[in-house]
């Protein structure tokens, strides 16, 4: 059996991380790869398009009902979806109570003990990335995920989150084998978005793996709780996800140790590639009317 690839998709909330990851993994499955998805986002939406479900029961909620995680069996928590993709959601506590990362730690340990990673080509962790706290950094910290793919856009907060995630990778890169596989730009139609994403990737000592164009067919598929690969397999957008999947498949061993940048450097990038072609500190804090 080929060696197991453990990858993770990180990105700020609302960036389209779960949608991008599920479509990409569906494409990998179509290529004959055996996939296990481990959802590490408290929203528990990392598998809905694969399972055609609103939200999968999480390991933490099932453990609470059963008494403890030791009372669960693998078949209790794992569901099989499109292209035989196996799906698990770690879950998290009620809002305002406890650490959301606890579910990630509990779930990964349980899955390993139960042999969930056997006969698998890819394990994919779908992780919230606004805050790289200890729990959410678990796949990185414990040397589980070897390749991190950051879903971002040309918007400032998405880039800020990508830089923060890179800091988390850097912290554990030397003690473990984790590497930044690359950035995936989920287009938001901001000015000079492709150039900006490419420039940020270069600053982070990485590369832009793929620029995913915006297409309403993604939302049409989501309303039916389906990936584009299943909903419209011959569409141009399905082809984009297949291209992305191929690039990730060919990217084994090509990850890098990232070089995060400062906030000033990030703002400079935005000014160079965004709405303001010239960096002019005198314009900071002035309205559009005054600036004109």
UniProtKB/Swiss-Prot annotation:
Keywords: 4Fe-4S, ADP-ribosylation, ATP-binding, Iron, Iron-sulfur, Metal-binding, Nitrogen fixation, Nucleotide-binding, Oxidoreductase. [4Fe-4S] cluster binds at residues 99, 133. The keyword Amino-acid biosynthesis does not apply. The reversible ADP-ribosylation of Arg-102 inactivates the nitrogenase reductase and regulates nitrogenase activity. Coiled coil: none annotated. GO terms for biological process: nitrogen fixation. Binds 1 [4Fe-4S] cluster per dimer. GO terms for molecular function: 4 iron, 4 sulfur cluster binding; ATP binding; metal ion binding; nitrogenase activity. SUPFAM superfamilies: P-loop containing nucleoside triphosphate hydrolases (SSF52540). The keyword Ligase does not apply. Gene3D superfamilies: P-loop containing nucleotide triphosphate hydrolases (3.40.50.300). It comes from the Bacteria. Its EC number is 1.18.6.1. ATP binds at residues 11-18. It catalyses: N2 + 8 reduced [2Fe-2S]-[ferredoxin] + 16 ATP + 16 H2O = H2 + 8 oxidized [2Fe-2S]-[ferredoxin] + 2 NH4(+) + 16 ADP + 16 phosphate + 6 H(+). CDD domains: NifH. PROSITE patterns: NIFH_FRXC_1, NIFH_FRXC_2, NIFH_FRXC_3. The modification ADP-ribosylarginine is found at residue 102. Homodimer. Belongs to the NifH/BchL/ChlL family. The key enzymatic reactions in nitrogen fixation are catalyzed by the nitrogenase complex, which has 2 components: the iron protein and the molybdenum-iron protein. This is Nitrogenase iron protein. It comes from Herbaspirillum seropedicae. The gene is nifH.
């Amino acid at each position: 059996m080929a060696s197991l690839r453990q990858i993770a998709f990180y990105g700020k909330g609302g960036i389209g991380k779960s949608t991008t990851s599920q479509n990409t993994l569906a494409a990998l499955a179509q290529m004959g790869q055996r996939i296990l998805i481990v959802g590490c986002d408290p929203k528990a939406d990392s598998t809905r398009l694969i399972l055609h479900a609103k939200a999968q029961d999480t390991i933490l909620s099932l453990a609470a009902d059963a008494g403890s995680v030791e009372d669960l069996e693998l078949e209790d928590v794992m569901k099989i979806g499109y292209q035989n993709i196996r799906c698990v959601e770690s879950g998290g506590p009620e809002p305002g109570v406890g650490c959301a990362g606890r579910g990630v730690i509990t779930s990964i340990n349980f899955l390993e003990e139960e042999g969930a990673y056997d006969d698998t080509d890819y394990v994919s962790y779908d992780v919230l990335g606004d805050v790289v706290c200890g729990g959410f950094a678990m796949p990185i910290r414990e040397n589980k995920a070897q390749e991190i793919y950051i879903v971002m856009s040309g918007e400032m907060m998405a880039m800020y989150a990508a830089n923060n995630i890179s800091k988390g990778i850097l912290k554990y890169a030397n003690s473990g084998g984790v590497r930044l596989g690359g950035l995936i730009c989920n287009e938001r139609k901001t000015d000079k978005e492709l150039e900006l994403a490419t420039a940020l990737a270069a600053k982070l000592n990485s590369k832009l793996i793929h620029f995913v164009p915006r297409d309403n067919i993604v939302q049409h598929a989501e309303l039916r709780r389906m990936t584009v690969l299943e909903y419209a397999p011959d569409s141009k957008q399905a082809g984009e996800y297949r291209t992305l999947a191929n690039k990730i498949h060919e990217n084994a061993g090509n990850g890098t140790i990232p070089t995060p940048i400062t906030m000033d450097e990030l703002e400079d990038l935005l000014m160079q590639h965004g709405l303001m072609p010239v960096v002019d500190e005198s314009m900071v804090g002035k309205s559009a009317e005054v600036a004109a």
